[in-house]
Amino acid sequence: MSKLVVFLFCIQVCFIQNVYSQCLGRVGPGGPPLGPYGGPLGGPGYGPVGYGGCGGYGGSGIGNVAVAGELPVAGSTGVTGQVPVIGAVEFAGPACAVGSVSISGACGPTCGCGGSPFY
């Protein structure tokens, strides 16, 4: 086999791993049921069992979105269930709006305002 074919094959394998790691989350190289039952890595210095999760990149990050212009918005929105949102929204400039907003519930357990704080 030529070196180019081997190189392209390796690139394809990396692409496939990247795509499917988004769906599997933090599943380790041995799969979810096999992680706790594996042997220790590199001797007893790593504990009695192997590591359970060494999954691919989860796809989270920080980004900015800028929108300029007129934004005519009309209608109503109803959200029922759990909506995990952590972040901030900032408006700069005049924003003519009419309506009401009602937010009820509690934030996640990590912030400490809705549940017990997580340490």
Swiss-Prot record:
Pfam families in UniProt: Chorion_1
Chain segments carrying region Right arm: 104-119
Disulfide bonds: none
Record InterPro entries: Chorion (IPR002635)
Any single GO CC term annotated in Swiss-Prot or TrEMBL for this entry: egg chorion
Keyword Transport: no
The organism's place on the tree of life at top rank: Eukaryota
Signal keyword on record: yes
Signal peptide: 1-21
UniProtKB keywords: Repeat, Signal
GO biological process: chorion-containing eggshell formation
MF terms (GO), sorted A to Z: structural constituent of egg chorion
Region (Central domain): 56-103
Region ranges (Left arm): 22-55
Function noted in UniProt: This protein is one of many from the eggshell of the silk moth.
Family of the protein in this entry: Belongs to the chorion protein family.
Entry protein name: Chorion class CA protein ERA.2
Source lineage: Eukaryota, Metazoa, Ecdysozoa, Arthropoda, Hexapoda
Gene that encodes it: ERA.2
